């Protein structure tokens, strides 16, 4: 019965993705990570606490290396299981910078409930909420020779914007599949700070669907393919196809293909049972390369660890 329920839920998720696929496409208004599969709390609140122990995760991403003012993203996440691992909680702090003049700094909290739907499978339903400070130092922008004033850059913008999201995910010790909307706060309005400033800004819904599987080739080799589908209004749907090969649960090498954008190489090192490092090198088709570093520390010695999907 539980296996039938799990299969039914997964079919509903896939059907919903097909429905929204008709009208929605993806754009890059939300920062994305190449190593998202190792920090899925950042895109799906239902994942918080799924590793069974308190975990600290940090990611630093530098896009378009070598270009002055290139975008950078910093994220720090802490998550843990609660109530005998029937619930999960997480907190994420982040900072996104664009061309030195635009910055988003924020925090959000994630909470989920976990339901056992099969012998090894758990379905999690999660919500998140928080806020970020949207800062635009427009008066610092160099308008170039012969231009000292522009109405679009006449004043700075500094405001607090609420953030809320939702998601669900099914996990067992080999497989996962999840759907999430990282930010359900939608706005489409004029931001007026002074009489001659009329800066237009839009925030659309983003839909994420992700899935992955762990193949045990033998006791020393595991192959872990995964994919991520991103959809929003106003841009083409984007797919990330990823494969990682783990050797002796110690070191991993892999790669990804992001449709219409880039290919990338990844490597991870499980330095200790609690400490993991990762590095990703993005090679976009039309822009300079990008770098991303990842670190996770688990408090596994203080808390007994439960089963979790092996590639997280």
Question: Model-predicted segments: where are they?
Answer:
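Bacterial Sec-dependent N-terminal signal peptides
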Residues: 1-30, 243, 299
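Subset of outer-membrane beta-barrel
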Residues: 28-312
């Amino acid at each position: 019965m539980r296996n039938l329920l799990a299969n039914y839920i997964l079919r509903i998720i896939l059907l919903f993705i097909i429905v929204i696929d008709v009208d929605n496409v993806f754009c890059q208004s939300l920062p994305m990570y190449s190593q998202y599969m190792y920090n899925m709390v950042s895109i799906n609140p239902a994942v918080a606490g799924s590793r069974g122990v308190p975990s600290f995760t940090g990611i630093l991403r530098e896009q378009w290396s070598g270009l002055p003012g290139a975008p950078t993203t910093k994220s720090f996440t802490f998550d843990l299981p609660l109530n005998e691992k029937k619930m999960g909680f997480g907190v994420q702090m982040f900072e996104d910078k664009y061309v030195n003049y635009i910055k988003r700094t924020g925090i959000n909290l994630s909470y989920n409930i976990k339901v056992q739907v099969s012998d090894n499978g758990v379905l999690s339903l999660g919500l998140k909420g928080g806020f970020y400070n949207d800062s635009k130092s427009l008066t610092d922008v160099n308008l170039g020779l012969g231009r000292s004033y522009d109405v679009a850059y006449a004043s700075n913008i500094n405001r607090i914007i609420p953030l809320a999201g939702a998601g669900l995910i099914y996990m067992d010790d080999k497989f996962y599949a999840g759907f999430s909307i990282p930010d359900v706060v939608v706005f489409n309005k004029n931001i007026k700070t002074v009489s001659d400033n009329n800066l237009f800004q839009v925030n659309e819904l983003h839909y994420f669907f992700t899935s992955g599987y762990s193949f045990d080739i033998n006791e020393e080799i595991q192959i872990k393919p995964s994919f991520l589908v991103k959809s929003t209004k106003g841009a083409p749907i984007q797919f990330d196809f990823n494969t990682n090969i783990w050797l002796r649960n110690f070191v991993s090498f892999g790669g990804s293909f992001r449709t219409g954008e880039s290919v990338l190489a990844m490597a991870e090192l499980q330095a200790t049972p609690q400490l993991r490092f990762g590095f990703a090198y993005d090679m976009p088709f039309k822009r300079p390369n990008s770098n991303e570093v990842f670190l996770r520390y688990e408090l596994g010695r203080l808390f007994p660890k439960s089963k979790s999907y092996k590639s997280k």
